[in-house]
Amino acid sequence: MTLLASISSIGNVKSISKSNNFSSLSNSSLQSSNSIQCGGCGGGSPLIGTVGNLVGGVLVGTGIIVGTVIGTVNGVVGGLLNGPNCGCH
């Protein structure tokens, strides 16, 4: 559990530091961050959310569009695992 918390915090730091570089694309980066972070309500989703945050934080440096796609996929997977009321809407 401590390892997952550490990984999650590393992902958050990366996404915060990269968002300053993309200040002109603030709307896209905010949308990307929101998509990546949604993914769960319920028992099985915290791991998916943690992995999504880590991957999203790394991918913000390579492309906002890629981060948005990963976030959308994460939301769909979270919705499928947790039922119709969970995930990104």
Swiss-Prot record:
Could you state one GO biological process linked to this protein? sorocarp development
Write the signal peptide boundaries. none
- InterPro entries listed in its UniProt record: HssA/B-related
* Family in the record: Belongs to the hssA/B family.
Protein name as annotated: HssA/B-like protein 10
The record lists the organism as: Dictyostelium discoideum
Name of the encoding gene? hssl10
